[in-house]
Amino acid sequence: MGAFIAKMLLPTISSLVFVPAASVAAKRGFHMEAMVYFFTMFFTAIYHACDGPGLSILCFMKYDILEYFSVYGTAISMWVTLLALGDFDEPKRSSLTMFGVLTAAVRIYQDRLGYGIYSGPIGTAVFMITVKWLQKMKEKKGLYPDKSVYTQQVGPGCCFGALALMLRFYFEEWDYAYVHSFYHVSLAMSFILLLPKKNRYAGTGRNAAKLNCYTLCCCV
């Protein structure tokens, strides 16, 4: 019985892996991304807790709404992570962020189970990043960004991201609790790996922007 309960709670517990992702994002100066990860963790954990034994008291919203925000937070997390990787200049970065936030809200409201909820944000972001990097390569007449970005960030991050999506859409029927938990872990790892080492808009030294707990809690 104890093993069964532990297995049922696995998706809820594994949702907490987004906390380290939020912590890493905040440390690197990506405060907006950290808030999105925390938002995703909160609603994903509560959503899965409603499925768990004896945890229905945590369901402070309708199950359907919790599911919506769980999927929505995940899609937006993918979007802001890839935009951070692309290192777009302002105001393009802010405009693209809002574009993703608004379009994802409508798309996921229509269908929160199909491939398009994630393939749309990922495909659009990858296309924009590819165009930008190819333009930079043409200007520099060399590799852009540095080789280390491809080997240490893009390559490993994309591998974990692809693994997460495969687990989510193709293997969950094997054993939902374990597979979905590994999906959470793989997704969080992809966010951490794809995020640049430093946000150039966050400032440095005494001028560095800081994220406190009060601000972080405002996202929920």
Swiss-Prot record:
Topology with respect to the bilayer: Multi-pass membrane protein
Signal sequence extent: none
Annotated organism of origin: Danio rerio
Name of the protein in question: Protein myomaker
TM ranges: 2-22, 38-58, 65-85, 94-110, 113-133, 154-174, 176-196
Extracellular side, ranges: 1, 59-64, 111-112, 175
Record flagged with keyword Membrane: yes
InterPro entries xrefs: NGX6/PGAP6/MYMK (IPR021910)
